[in-house]
Amino acid sequence: MDWVMKHNGPNDASDGTVRLRGLPFGCSKEEIVQFFQGLEIVPNGITLTMDYQGRSTGEAFVQFASKEIAENALGKHKERIGHRYIEIFRSSRSEIKGFYDPPRRLLGQRPGPYDRPIGGRGGYYGAGRGSMYDRMRRGGDGYDGGYGGFDDYGGYNNYGYGNDGFDDRMRDGRGMGGHGYGGAGDASSGFHGGHFVHMRGLPFRATENDIANFFSPLNPIRVHIDIGADGRATGEADVEFVTHEDAVAAMSKDKNNMQHRYIELFLNSTPGGGSGMGGSGMGGYGRDGMDNQGGYGSVGRMGMGNNYSGGYGTPDGLGGYGRGGGGSGGYYGQGGMSGGGWRGMY
């Protein structure tokens, strides 16, 4: 508890709100309610944060009925949901609003330092012209209690940018052509295998090259380092491999060290998962078959009416990492009309 108190903001900033970190990426609001069983949460009091592509960040805000209840909630710090231990920090509604005020660079104004041209090197997660937040629906995910988002805003400004060295490694080492990380290659080339390993505990200065070297002699084909709303690395990353077997082999590196940090790995791959460009050209890294609305964050996809459309999709495209609201009509990080690579539906 002393650790929790030292790593939280001043007492007068709290209004009964806490921030959770380390949630399982398929975590639902119902699971959070169960985690805090016996502690009263206000209506519309749970916000599952997403990045601008509609993917879960593994964090959430929970507003309790009083400051006293929120203080009791801090006592559950380091308890588990599923296989993940949960970190809990004191927060406030103003902090939630700060995360979800749409940044100017997403609205077509002056680009920020992490925004890159869609068709150029490093454009993979840079916000393109016309990209928008997927708005969070109040009371979504089928939970009748009405827990929902805050001010209907989407999620973190989760930007990434390419690294020339990693581009060269991918291009030269695998003969893929185009631009490896953030590339503008042909979307039908089979470049996207849909086999991922999620990394947690990275040194905050870790680069794509560091991650590629960590998995040597395996060769990842894509690395995405998570960037938080403050423009800093979160210590997490997603790494794509060509085959399920490569992704499984990469798990042998679980708990190995990178510099002074030991790295936790989580497998997000299934045997036989294919590339995500099937069906009607819907999004991203979806797996298996026509009309798969799943995939890795459903990039560039409009809401198609099913409640669970987000990435790390199972073969039927339901559930998982980053949920989209049923019939929301929102875009999950749509690329510009001239965008290259796999960025999804144009």
UniProtKB/Swiss-Prot annotation:
Pfam families: RRM_1 (PF00076). There is a cross-link at K6, K67 (Glycyl lysine isopeptide (Lys-Gly) (interchain with G-Cter in SUMO2)). InterPro entries: ESRP, hnRNPH3_RRM2, hnRNPH3_RRM3, Nucleotide-bd_a/b_plait_sf, RBD_domain_sf, RRM_dom. Keywords: Acetylation, Isopeptide bond, Methylation, mRNA processing, Nucleus, Phosphoprotein, Repeat, Ribonucleoprotein, RNA-binding, Ubl conjugation. GO terms for biological process: epithelial cell differentiation; mRNA splicing, via spliceosome; regulation of RNA splicing; RNA processing; RNA splicing. The modification Phosphothreonine is found at T314. The modification Phosphoserine is found at S216, S298. The modification Asymmetric dimethylarginine is found at R121. It comes from the Eukaryota. One of its GO terms (cellular component) is ribonucleoprotein complex. The modification N-acetylmethionine is found at M1. One of its GO terms (molecular function) is RNA binding. Residues 16-93, 195-270 form the RRM domain. The modification Omega-N-methylarginine is found at R174, R287, R323, R343. The modification Phosphotyrosine is found at Y296. It is found in: Nucleus. PANTHER family: HETEROGENEOUS NUCLEAR RIBONUCLEOPROTEIN-RELATED. Involved in the splicing process and participates in early heat shock-induced splicing arrest. Due to their great structural variations the different isoforms may possess different functions in the splicing reaction. This is Heterogeneous nuclear ribonucleoprotein H3. The gene is HNRNPH3.
